[in-house]
């Protein structure tokens, strides 16, 4: 049962959730699995794998978020933005992607699941000019750290941070971080049932 697995995984990462939040997370997996058959939103085909590779892989970041206003760049079907929005109703999330089918899916998820703290925008990140800047700029499986910082440099507020979700951290990629940016924290993340390296880099503009 997916619900029992979700309960166990949330307990493992010590993340409390209401019954409504758990239902929304499971319903999101259900919608992702259903839409994926027609729209090819993710290469992960199995709901149990989606729970680990998409939901839990997103939620391990939740305790590290600082601020109220976030943007998830290159969000795809809404990852990590939708799971994080479900678990953080006090924060708002802009989900940015350049593919219309992904944006349509996100909007349907928000409508069906009653998620009121996300807004989905179809745009390339370089072209997106927000009226209000963000406390946090999230990136998961979007681009190299160098490209993320180059393309998203205009998005954080004065004291905002970049949150780069990465797998393996290569010395080469770290050395290519552009001038004017500083890694303030590197956090090793533990995702339940995922025997792969996961890291969160917090980065600020100097």
From Swiss-Prot:
GO terms for cellular component: cytosol. GO terms for molecular function: rRNA (guanine-N7-)-methyltransferase activity. It catalyses: guanosine(527) in 16S rRNA + S-adenosyl-L-methionine = N(7)-methylguanosine(527) in 16S rRNA + S-adenosyl-L-homocysteine. InterPro entries: rRNA_ssu_MeTfrase_G, SAM-dependent_MTases_sf. Transmembrane segments: none annotated. It is found in: Cytoplasm. Keywords: Cytoplasm, Methyltransferase, rRNA processing, S-adenosyl-L-methionine, Transferase. Its EC number is 2.1.1.170. It comes from the Bacteria. Pfam families: GidB (PF02527). S-adenosyl-L-methionine binds at residues 74, 79, 125-126, 140. Gene3D superfamilies: Vaccinia Virus protein VP39. Specifically methylates the N7 position of guanine in position 527 of 16S rRNA. Belongs to the methyltransferase superfamily. RNA methyltransferase RsmG family. This is Ribosomal RNA small subunit methyltransferase G. It comes from Shewanella sp. (strain ANA-3).
């Amino acid at each position: 049962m997916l619900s029992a697995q979700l309960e166990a995984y949330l307990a493992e990462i010590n993340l409390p959730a209401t019954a409504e939040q758990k239902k929304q997370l499971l319903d999101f997996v259900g919608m992702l699995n259903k839409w994926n058959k027609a729209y090819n939103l993710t290469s992960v085909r199995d709901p149990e794998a989606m729970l680990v590779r998409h939901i839990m892989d997103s939620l391990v970041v939740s305790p590290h978020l600082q601020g109220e206003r976030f943007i998830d760049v290159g969000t795809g079907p809404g990852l990590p933005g939708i799971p994080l929005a479900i678990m953080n109703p006090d924060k708002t999330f802009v989900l940015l992607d350049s593919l219309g089918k992904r944006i349509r899916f996100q909007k349907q998820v928000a409508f069906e699941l009653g998620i009121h703290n996300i807004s989905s925008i179809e745009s390339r990140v370089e072209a997106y000019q927000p009226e209000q800047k963000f406390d946090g700029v999230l990136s998961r499986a979007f681009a190299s750290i160098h490209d993320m910082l180059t393309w998203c440099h205009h998005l954080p507020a004065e004291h905002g941070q970049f949150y780069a979700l990465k797998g393996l951290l290569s010395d080469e990629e770290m050395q290519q971080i552009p001038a004017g940016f500083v890694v303030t924290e590197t956090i090793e993340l533990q995702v339940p049932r995922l025997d792969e390296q996961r890291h969160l880099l917090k980065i600020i503009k100097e």
